[in-house]
Structures are given as structure tokens and as C-alpha cells.
Amino acid sequence: MFIFCTNRYNLHKFAAGTLNNSNYQILIEVPEENSLNDWLAVNTVEFYNRLNLFYGALRSNCTNESCPIMKGGPNIEYYWKRKKKTIPPDYIENVMVLIEKILDNPKVFPPDESVKFPKNFKRVTKEIFTKLYRIFAHIYVCHFQDIENIGAVSHLNTTYKHFYFFSRKFKLIKKREYEPLKFLNIKFEIQEEKKEKERQKQLQENNSQNKNN
């Protein structure tokens, strides 16, 4: 995907490492001396890889019989191109194949800094994130029990929480698309607000101690 030892390769490794860190508000910020497009690119690749692994673990539980509708909630159904009804296994396979082709296209996702990003790069990124979000929604709504059965709830929550805050920060997904998981999103927002208050409190205490010393 990214050429070894290039800045983009190293940035991707950094992004992959941050997905297990809980300080999301800081981690989603663009690192110094890197462009927004670089940051969007490496995180898009990493979120795709992570979600692909989750779905791979669930594939045997998402079948034509057990999962006949590509749902993101009780009244939310996702269609493939031109409002074509598609069963979840086919829909998700179509999405993953399409995204993989985009990620492998060096004109869209340049492997190193010698090639510039296309002018429509953020729009392409938005389309990818929207499609990935719909798969997250389907997994949470229709396969959460399966996730519990394989002991991967905390891993899914960690990945999705990072994905949610990242997509919200850079406005990659339209507000209405968040509807299926809005209660989970609110829960995560409250958690992060609490963490941030605790962090600020700790900083104040540390500053106060330093002054006294």
C-alpha cells in the first residue's frame, strides 16, 4: 500500500499503533509536519484493515439465511447501487472489494510523497468512511451477540470509538448516517468528556504542585 521507509509508510505504522490508545481526542489530531490528506489516507487504510478483520471473524454467522437484510437498525436498510436490494454477505463483500480497489489505486492513494493526492481525495475518503460506517452499524445491530461469543466486544468498541471520533472531527460522514448508533455515540462522547475533565483536573493539580515546589 505505502512504500517502505517513506513518510506515508511510517505515518501508517504510527496510525496503526494509536488505535489501541484511549486518548482519542488527542490521537485524532493531524501530527505535526504532516498534511491532512496524508493523515486521512493512512487512517482510512487502517480502519479498513481493522473492520475487514472483524467481518472476517463473523463471516460464517452472516449468511443468506441468518441475515437476509442489510440492516443498520429496525427501520434502516442499506442498498447497493441504484437502490438494489442486496443481502448482507454480498453487500459487505461488494463494499470491501470496491474499497480495496480504491486503496490499491496509486492515483487515488499515492504510495509515497512523489505523487500528489487527487483534488477529490476528501470526497473519496468520505464515500469510503460512509460505507465502512454502515458495516459497523450492521455488525453492532445484527451481530453483537456473535462479537460477544468470540470475546471481541472491547476490541470492536475501541476500533469503532476511534473511527467515530475521527470521522466526526474531519466531517467525513453526514450527520444522518450516524443515526443507527446514535445512543452508542452519545455514550462514547460522555465517556470522553469525563476523561477530558479528569485530564484537565490532573494537569491543574500537577501545575499547582510544581509551583509549590
What are these regions (language model features)?
Residues 63-66, 107-115, 140-155, 171-183, ...:
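Structured alpha-helical bundle/scaffold domains in large eukaryotic membrane-trafficking regulators
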Residues 122-173:
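Chromatin/DNA-recognition segments of nuclear transcriptional regulators
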